[in-house]
Amino acid sequence: MQPYSDNSVNFRMMLAGYRAAARRYHAGRLTQDVAATYHPLFEALNWVVALDEQAGARWSPRGEPLGSKWRDEIDGGDHVDAVRFARNRAHHQWADALVLSEGFAFPITFPLVTHEWAWRPSTDLPKGKNDSGRLAYDRLLANRPARFSLQQLDETYSYVADLLERPSAQPSA
């Protein structure tokens, strides 16, 4: 896996960083340690934004990069819209967009966990000037566990990686 000709890191390399953070998040969910989940969740969500920027800058199916419009072209792009809405409202303070809940979230998965990070309702997010992505946020993220978002975003970005770059062996992360 080589960087792009301008020496930037390629999309699959960035996706591997996202996946490594998501794996650490899922492993941390099995502990009693809140930091073991928050730190990798914060990292994974920042990877989401970096991958979004790369997809918009690099994907040009009609000759010109699509920018944020790439999200309208594929299934799952609305999840990226929703996360971007949260990020823009929280101004990089992901703790303002997520809440730690104690107890179980449905559907129940095994092994059982004692805590779960979930997205706050949009009405609880800091106020902002731009409502772009709010409907997607309310529909897809609000009051739902972050783990569901991480899975959907992985599927979305895997598809984008196949569009941008030929599939090849991924680096271990």
Roles of regions detected by a PLM:
Residues 1-42, 63-173:
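Acidic, Ser/Thr/Gly/Pro-rich intrinsically disordered interaction regions
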Residues 16-20, 50-56:
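Short, functional N-terminal and low-complexity linear motifs
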Residues 52-63, 95:
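Membrane-helix exit/interface motif
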Residues 42-47, 54:
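Core of folded catalytic or high-affinity ligand/protein-binding domains
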